[in-house]
């Protein structure tokens, strides 16, 4: 992701997920993140809480500027953080993610979502459902505004909580340009 290179003033934490059963790895032989509250004893939500507490205590981070980003399962966890820790998260930058159907969003937060139309791991139709839910919660209705190649911006009627999408033609990939777009978006959003 190299966010620290693009935003050297930020404190960036890259935690490593533990082995986690997923639909694509039922045995849980690869690292990942919990997708819904209650999974895995909430180990990942508890880890997030501990990271935030440590960062606040040790580095005096700006409480209004805590963000979540991720790719694939990490994006799913970022969406879970929006659902379960909206008081902590200012905005989300996710690539090839979705919100687990057992979860719901109740608090508006700015979102930049990057999705591939040919994604067979996180099917585009499922990613699109999550984007639509985010737009609904954020009050970002309407057709949106073009904002560049593959880009659409959905301004919010509820304040500075837009939904911005980049929908590219490829599959389940982290595009080379994704981190640049995510950092640009996150830098301009803080909690109200």
Where are each of the predicted segments found?
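Alpha-helical scaffolding within the catalytic cores
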Residues: 1-2, 95-103, 146-156
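Primarily recognizes the serine-hydrolase "nucleophile elbow" in alpha/beta-hydrolase
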Residues: 57, 64-109
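Short alpha-helix in the alpha/beta-hydrolase fold that links the catalytic acid
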Residues: 123-136, 145-154
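Stable alpha-helical elements in mature extracytoplasmic
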Residues: 44-51, 73-81, 85-88, 126-130, ...
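C-terminal catalytic histidine-bearing segment of alpha/beta-hydrolase fold enzymes
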Residues: 114, 140-192
């Amino acid at each position: 992701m190299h966010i620290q290179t693009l935003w050297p003033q930020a404190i960036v934490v890259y935690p490593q997920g533990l082995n986690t059963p997923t639909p694509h790895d039922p045995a849980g032989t690869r690292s990942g993140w919990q997708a819904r509250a209650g999974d895995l004893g909430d180990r990942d939500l508890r880890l997030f809480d501990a990271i935030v507490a440590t960062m606040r205590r040790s580095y005096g981070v700006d409480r209004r500027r805590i963000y979540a980003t991720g790719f694939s399962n990490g994006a799913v966890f970022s969406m879970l953080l929006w659902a379960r820790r909206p008081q902590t998260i200012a905005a989300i930058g996710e690539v090839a993610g979705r919100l687990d159907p057992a979860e719901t969003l109740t608090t508006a937060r700015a979102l930049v979502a990057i999705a591939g139309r040919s994604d067979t791991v996180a099917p585009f139709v499922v990613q699109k459902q999550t984007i639509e839910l985010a737009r609904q919660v954020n009050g970002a209705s309407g057709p949106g505004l073009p904002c560049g190649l593959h880009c659409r911006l959905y301004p919010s009627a509820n304040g500075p909580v837009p939904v911005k999408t980049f929908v590219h033609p490829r599959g389940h990939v982290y595009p080379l340009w994704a981190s640049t777009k995510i950092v640009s978006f996150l830098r301009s959003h803080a909690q109200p």
